[in-house]
């Protein structure tokens, strides 16, 4: 993952979609303005009540036919490998019945690493994985979607699992 992932999707697609981003980005001068112009949905990640209200708003957007782009890693760092996927996107897919289309974005971390602002040459690519759809509205189904997405991304990216560090 990289700062470039969203820009790559914007520049390489004619589809109309909205990003889902952490609420803190709305307060950032450049990123907030850019994301608001793209019609982003900002979500609360800390306060459960705010997060629940945001989830309902996202379900309404999905029911209205809006395409949402969610980066399920939630964040990124300089370390290689795929981070654990957060459950939000998969719970939304299970609750709404919306189709999930995993996208594997490669090369952006090498091109612009976390904490660096000078790009390095790298091949960029976006791989579309097979679409997934929930078969029922349940937590176990959301877990199945998460695990299937993770397996598809790891296969396309040819990256290792990233083992989280504790302490």
What do the predicted segments below correspond to?
Residues 52-167:
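Non-catalytic C-terminal accessory region of glycerolipid acyltransferases
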């Amino acid at each position: 993952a990289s700062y470039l992932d969203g820009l790559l999707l914007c520049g390489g697609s004619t589809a109309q979609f909205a990003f889902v981003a952490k609420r803190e980005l709305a307060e950032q001068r450049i990123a907030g303005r850019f994301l608001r112009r793209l019609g982003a949905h900002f979500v609360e990640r800390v306060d459960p009540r705010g997060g629940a209200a945001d989830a309902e708003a996202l379900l309404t957007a999905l029911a209205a036919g809006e395409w949402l782009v969610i980066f399920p890693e939630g964040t990124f760092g300089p370390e290689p490998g795929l981070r654990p996927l957060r459950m939000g996107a998969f719970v939304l897919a299970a609750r709404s019945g919306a189709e999930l289309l995993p996208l594997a974005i490669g090369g952006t971390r090498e091109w612009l690493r976390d904490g660096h602002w000078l790009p390095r040459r790298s091949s960029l690519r976006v791989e579309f994985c097979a679409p997934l759809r929930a078969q029922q509205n349940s937590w176990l189904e959301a877990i199945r979607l998460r695990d299937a997405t993770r397996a598809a991304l790891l296969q396309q990216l040819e990256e290792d699992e990233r083992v989280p560090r504790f302490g």
